[in-house]
């Protein structure tokens, strides 16, 4: 059975672990526990063939900047996550996350993933953002950044409601199996 390695990166508290737990167990975790490094595996059927989707959760906190890249070798696709209600996590996609993964894995495809879309219309969240003269990140802003950074595409979801959740992983699988440059093997390698 072929394995697809998918590594999830992004700032702390943007919902990476919830995304993975909600997808793999259909349950939403009730409390926040910062991740050091976790992995999950699910079997998916693609064109009648079984694949193992290996999902690697990483810690977004700066304390783990040197440890995190140890999970990158042999990655088939990255999910670069930000919260649509955290403009700073959106900025860090460009400032930190994409530079980090492209430094280690230049040719590995990645998706830009907007998380926590259920909070985009929540009154208390909008009030907190407004106090800092901020607004939620829009679908258009996500698509624009994805294009600018050469992501395979922009997708968004809610781990809480599961809206768009399956699509994130379907698109990740497609990106891993159908890389845009079919002549080159695009797994991440450390030299």
Swiss-Prot record:
This is Cdc42 homolog. One of its GO terms (cellular component) is adherens junction. A motif (Effector region) lies at residues 32-40. The modification Cysteine methyl ester is found at residue 188. Residues 189-191 form a propeptide. It is found in: Cell junction, Adherens junction; Cell membrane. It is an enzyme of class 3 (hydrolase). A lipid is attached at residue 188 (S-geranylgeranyl cysteine).
């Amino acid at each position: 059975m072929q394995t697809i390695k998918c590594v999830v990166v992004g700032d702390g508290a943007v919902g990476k672990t919830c995304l993975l737990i909600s997808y793999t167990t259909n349950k939403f975790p009730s409390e926040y526990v910062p991740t050091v490094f976790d992995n999950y595996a699910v079997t998916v059927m693609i064109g009648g063939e079984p694949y193992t989707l290996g999902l690697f959760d990483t810690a977004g906190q700066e304390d783990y900047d040197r440890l995190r890249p140890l999970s990158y070798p042999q990655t088939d696709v990255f999910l670069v996550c930000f919260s649509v209600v955290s403009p700073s996590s959106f900025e860090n996609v460009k400032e930190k996350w994409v530079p980090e993964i492209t430094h280690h894995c230049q040719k590995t495809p990645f998706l830009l993933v907007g998380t926590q879309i259920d909070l985009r219309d929540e009154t208390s969240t909008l009030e907190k953002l407004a106090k800092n003269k901020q607004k939620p990140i829009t679908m258009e802003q996500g698509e624009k950044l994805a294009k600018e950074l050469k992501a395979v595409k922009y997708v968004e979801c809610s781990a809480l409601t599961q809206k768009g959740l399956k699509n994130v992983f379907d698109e990740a699988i497609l990106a891993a199996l159908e890389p845009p440059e079919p002549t080159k093997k695009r797994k991440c390698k450390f030299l």
